[in-house]
C-alpha cells in the first residue's frame, strides 16, 4: 500500500516519458521517512503544504534542473502572480518544524490512529479498500452498507466529523460515489489519541443513525 516508484520509473523510461509524483497527501510522511520517497526516481514532485505537512495553504514544485525553464514558464505568468511573502515565511517555518523529533512523533501517532480505526472498521464488517492502511487515510467501500459516500459525508458533517465522498471500482456515477475517504492529522491536533473518542462514540451508536 505504498508506491513502487522504481517500477513507475521503468515504465516511464520504456515510454520515453516524464515521471511525476503529486505527494500532497503523504508529504508529511515522506518528510519523516514514514513513507517511501519519490525523489530518487521522479522527474517532478509536487505537494501542498497544508495537509500532513500541517503548514499554510500553499504548494511546492521540485524538479530536475533540466526542466527548470519549462516549469518556470508554465508557472509564471500563466498561473502565478505576485508572491505572498507571508505565506512563504509560513512554509519555511513549517518545513523547519517538519525536521523536528516532535513532528516525527506526531506523524507516527497519526498513522497509529488510522490503523486503530481501520481495525475497528474491519471488525465491524466494513470493507476497506486494500484491507487497511499504511498511512493516514482510510478508503471505505460502502456498497455493502446501502449508503452512498455523498450521504455519509453529509451525515458526518452534521456531527463534526470531516470526511469526503470518493469513487471506488464499479461505481457508475462519480457524483455520489460508494466510497468515503477519511484522514486523521486533524483529529490528532485536536488531541484524539488512538481515535478513542471516535471509536467509543461509534460503539455506542452516537451520531451514526441515518
List where the protein language model places each region.
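Conserved PLP-enzyme active-site core in the AAT-like
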Residues: 1-125, 146
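Detector for Asparagine
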Residues: 13-16, 85-86, 113, 122-125, ...
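Residues at secondary-structure transition points
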Residues: 34, 65, 138, 189-192, ...
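Short, basic, helix/turn surface patches
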Residues: 45-55, 154-159, 186-195, 201
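PLP-dependent enzyme catalytic core of the Aspartate aminotransferase-like
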Residues: 112-113, 174-210
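Conserved PLP-binding catalytic core of the aspartate aminotransferase-like
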Residues: 127-181, 185, 189
Amino acid at each position: 500500500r505504498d508506491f513502487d516508484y522504481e517500477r513507475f520509473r521503468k515504465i516511464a523510461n520504456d515510454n520515453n516519458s516524464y515521471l511525476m509524483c503529486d505527494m500532497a497527501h503523504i508529504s508529511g510522511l515522506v518528510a519523516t521517512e514514514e513513507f517511501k520517497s519519490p525523489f530518487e526516481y521522479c522527474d517532478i514532485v509536487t505537494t501542498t503544504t497544508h495537509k500532513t505537512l500541517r503548514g499554510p495553504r500553499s504548494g511546492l514544485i521540485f524538479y530536475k534542473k533540466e526542466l527548470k525553464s519549462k516549469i518556470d514558464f508554465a508557472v509564471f505568468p500563466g498561473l502565478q502572480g505576485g508572491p505572498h511573502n507571508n505565506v512563504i515565511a509560513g512554509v519555511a517555518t513549517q518545513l523547519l518544524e517538519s525536521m523536528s523529533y516532535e513532528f516525527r512523533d506526531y506523524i507516527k501517532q497519526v498513522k497509529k490512529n488510522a490503523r486503530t480505526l481501520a481495525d475497528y472498521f474491519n471488525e465491524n464488517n466494513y470493507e476497506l479498500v486494500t484491507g487497511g492502511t499504511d498511512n493516514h487515510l482510510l478508503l471505505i467501500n460502502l456498497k455493502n452498507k446501502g449508503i452512498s459516500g455523498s450521504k455519509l459525508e453529509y451525515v458526518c458533517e452534521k456531527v463534526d466529523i470531516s470526511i469526503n465522498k470518493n469513487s471506488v471500482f464499479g461505481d457508475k456515477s462519480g457524483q455520489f460515489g460508494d466510497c468515503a475517504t477519511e484522514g486523521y492529522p486533524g483529529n490528532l491536533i485536536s488531541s484524539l489519541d488512538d481515535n478513542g473518542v471516535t471509536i467509543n462514540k461509534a460503539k455506542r451508536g452516537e451520531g451514526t443513525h441515518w
